[in-house]
Amino acid sequence: MECKMSFFKYRVMKRLFLFAVCAWAGLSLWASSVKGQGTACETRSEKVPAKVYMIKEISPENLMKVYEALGRKATGKVAVKLSTGEPGNNNYLDPALIKGLVQKVDGTIVECNTAYGGGRSDTEKHLKAAKDHGFTAIAPVVIMDADGEVSLPVKGGKHLKEDFVGKAYPEYDFTVVLSHFKGHPMGGFGGAIKNISIGIASSSGKAYIHSAGKTKSVKEVWGKLPPQDDFLESMAEAAKAVADHCGDRILYI
C-alpha cells in the first residue's frame, strides 16, 4: 500500500509541477505585457519573449536545472514564496523536492495568514502547520504579516489602488516563487499569479483583493464578494503591484 501511495503521489506531483511551469510561463508573458509602464527597480527596457523550460521527470536535481536555466540568480536576502498548505491537506510542495533549491539560494520560506478560519488564520497556528508539513526542517519560515502590513502601489488599477502585503515582505531583496497547481473556488485554479497576489497579501489584504477593494475586514468580506471578473482582475492587479515592486528581482518556478 505504501508503495502504491508513493507512486500515486509522484504522478500527482508530476502533473502539478508541469501545470506550475505553465503558470510561470503565463505570468512571465503577462509581466512582459505590462513592462512598458516602467518601475523604479526595472532594468530591462524592451520586451523579451518568455522561454518555457520543461522537465520530463520531477526531482530535486531537475528542479535545480530549471533554476539554472532561467539565468537569473537569487541574491541578497531571498524570500521563497510557496503555499504551506492547510492542516490535514497534502496538496503542497514536498519539502524533499524543494530543499536543495531553497538551501542553494539561502532562502527563507515566507507566507501570510489566511482571511478565513482554517488552520493558518493566525501566526501560531500557521507556523505549526508549516512545521507539521516539514517546511521548518529545511529552512527558516516567516509569516510576513505577523506584525502587520504595508502597502504597495497598484499602478493603473481598475479596482485596487494599493496592495496590502505582509509588513516583512519589503525586507527581502529577491523573491523565488514556487507554485503548484491547485483549485480555487473563485478563481477556478491557482498558480503563480495567485501565489504572489493573495499569497503575499496580509490577511486583511486578502480580504481587500477578494472583495475587489470594497473591504479589508476578514469578517465582512465573504458577504461582499464581487462579480467573478472583478475578483480576477483585482488578483491580477495585486500581482502586478508585487511584480512592479520586484522588477527583475523575482523568478517563477
Residue ranges: model-predicted function:
Residues 44-82, 86-99, 104-253:
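Extended, low-polarity segments enriched in aliphatic/aromatic residues
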Residues 8-38:
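Bacterial Sec-dependent N-terminal signal peptides
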